[in-house]
Amino acid sequence: MTIRRIAATLACTLAFAAPIMAAAPALVALDSAVYVERIVPNKGRLLQPASALKRGDRVVYVVSWTRMGGQGSFTVTNPLPKKVYYQGSADGREEVSLDGGRSWGRLDALRVGDRLATPEDVTHVRWRVPANEAGRGSGQIIYSAIVR
């Protein structure tokens, strides 16, 4: 093989390898905390660690993420416990699933049979963290649910 052919082969190999390296999956560490929202006279709403829950309690989930490596965007998916129904997230960019994570969409655009989906139908919730936000290195996703 000539030097020119070796150089051309190496250049082609690097050209194809570069996008693969750039598209390496994001390495993300997640940490979750669960709080219950309490209304306290003269203090308003307080979040307390959720040690005991009862029907009707508003639960606030805080998912903290830290970028450990990789590039690009990533997705955070959380299944909802059967004992709660979804209320919404702080940023409104979430997608929900009604079928255990097989299909996704905005709650206001999904249907169950011939009716619009309701928060009680949600089984999973996910957020797509775009590359520009992921590049900051860390962040939080906050959403709430009501205990059934």
Residue ranges and their predicted role:
Residues 2-3, 7, 22-148:
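Exported/extracytosolic protein signature
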